[in-house]
């Protein structure tokens, strides 16, 4: 992970290569970077192929105790909450796949830039038998309209960048493929810096407005953990892992 700060804007590159999985360690590293005393805005990026593939299924499969599974899911929840509780703007640049937890952290951002490409964006929790807790759903509900939220949350569709834009998963779409991915990313970064500067200049009114959009929703994670260890869910996960190992 690479982090730079300039003009009160912190840019977090989760990784130039690889799937940018949200391990407990990586999630805690990102949370630690959301420090309002160090910066007033955050831009988070992946790489040209993957923004983030979400939780590491291998970590989950290797977890033998409920406490281990609880730590993984609760840390993801903490990461999403940290995006919403950071007083300044958190802006995501989605230039590659944003799947499951990766999609969630993008949706937990205040604003999202997307671009052309073969990558996909979506939530697949229901397909593998994992609960999408109400607290996580509440966090993303400010990003997606009511008419699209149910479809996005339950049907496990993997949207193209243009479809993601139409569904509200991203706010701005850079759709000119002739400029190339690097220039598209640079353009998204330029726009993100400009928007971050605008919100920084807005000051306390923006901070108060962002705080007013927060919703307190409780969820018993013991339900999720119990479901994770059920034979049905384990069978689905093993099927997914088998498919991934063949790619």
Kindly give the residue locations of the regions a language model identified.
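Glycine-rich beta-to-alpha active-site loop
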Residues: 79-128, 158
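Conserved CoA-thioester-binding segment of acyl-CoA-metabolizing enzymes
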Residues: 1-45
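Hydrophobic/aromatic residues within transmembrane alpha-helices
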Residues: 44, 105-107, 164, 240
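Hydrophobic, secondary-structure "cap" segments at the distal end of domains
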Residues: 136-147
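Well-ordered beta-strand positions
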Residues: 111, 151, 155-157, 163, ...
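C-terminal long alpha-helix characteristic of the crotonase
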Residues: 114-119, 170-222, 238
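Glycine- (often His-adjacent) and acidic-residue-rich active-site loop
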Residues: 2, 46-79
């Amino acid at each position: 992970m690479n982090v730079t700060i300039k003009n009160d804007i912190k840019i977090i590159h989760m990784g130039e290569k690889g799937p940018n999985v949200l391990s407990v360690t990586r999630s805690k590293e990102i949370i630690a970077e959301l420090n309002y005393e160090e910066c007033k805005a955050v831009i988070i990026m992946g790489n040209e192929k993957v923004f983030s593939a979400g939780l590491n299924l291998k970590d989950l499969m290797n977890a033998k105790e409920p406490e281990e599974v609880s730590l993984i899911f609760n840390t993801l929840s903490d990461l999403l909450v940290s995006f919403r509780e950071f007083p300044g703007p958190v802006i995501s640049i989605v230039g590659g796949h944003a799947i499951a937890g990766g999609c969630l952290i993008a949706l937990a951002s205040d604003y999202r830039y997307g671009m052309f490409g073969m990558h996909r964006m979506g939530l697949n929790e229901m397909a593998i038998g994992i609960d999408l807790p109400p607290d996580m759903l509440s966090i993303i509900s400010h990003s997606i309209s009511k008419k699209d939220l149910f479809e996005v949350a339950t049907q496990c569709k993997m949207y193209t960048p243009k479809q993601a834009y139409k569904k509200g998963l991203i706010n701005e779409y850079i759709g000119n493929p002739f400029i190339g991915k690097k220039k598209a990313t640079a353009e998204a970064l330029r726009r993100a810096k400009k928007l971050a500067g605008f919100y920084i200049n807005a000051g306390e009114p923006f901070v108060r407005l962002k705080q007013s959009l927060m919703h307190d929703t409780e969820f018993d994670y013991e339900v999720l953990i119990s479901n994770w260890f059920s034979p049905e869910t384990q069978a689905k996960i093993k099927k997914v892992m088998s498919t991934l190992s063949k790619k």
